[in-house]
Amino acid sequence: MAQDPTRAGSEPPDWAGEVMQLSQSEITALATKAARGAGLSWGEAEEAGWACGWLARAGLPAPAMLLRGLDAESSASPLRAGIRLMDHAGLPEGPCALPVTLQDVAEPLVLVPFLARVAERMGAPVDLDLGSHTICLTGREPVPDLSALRGICHRTGARATISVSQSSRAAAPGRFDGRIERGVWQSLDALALLTTVPASEVSRQRAGAQSSDND
């Protein structure tokens, strides 16, 4: 039976080399479980999985970017920052009423899917200014091609400024990149395995007590 690369704790698949190709749904599932294993709530983990799939659609090395985002300290986490910005989008005190600057962000391109959702909810394009590059997100389909930005992945300690954009020019559509390196897959799979830890003796006893009460 073929190995399922999204199943937590699965044996490494039959790699033809150091890189394997996953589908968008496989990337999303693996990323969601890994994010949960890394300590995010299930709701946050689902958002992280969605963002990872979005980044892959934009032509970026999404699994590796997610892994670095999960490794970041909480204060530098692009996942937590992106989720906060997205949750507050559209409110009177929303994040883009005035420019917002985030300091010391790890893997800042992970913010991009969340800012696309911010733009969608606000009904206005949003700029992400990273100093050397400015990315305009309209929130409309298709997902833009960001493959030219692969060279600025791995950044740490970045300064990111988010503001309402003065431009609504749509970028060319992205081309899906489902490649994942063996080491990245193994690290994400190890995190995903943490979601399948057996129940503790205390939790089993509690479950038994609840069953007895219902007899």
Where do the model's predicted regions map?
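Short, structured coil/loop segments at alpha-helix boundaries
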Residues: 41-42, 107-109, 177, 181
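Glycine-centered secondary-structure boundary/capping sites
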Residues: 18-21, 39, 59, 90, ...
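Proteins with a high burden of low-complexity, intrinsically disordered sequence enriched in S/T/G/P/A and R
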Residues: 3-20, 44-45, 130, 148-156, ...
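Long alpha-helical, hydrophobic tracts
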Residues: 1-82
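A glycine-rich, acidic short-motif signal
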Residues: 63-145
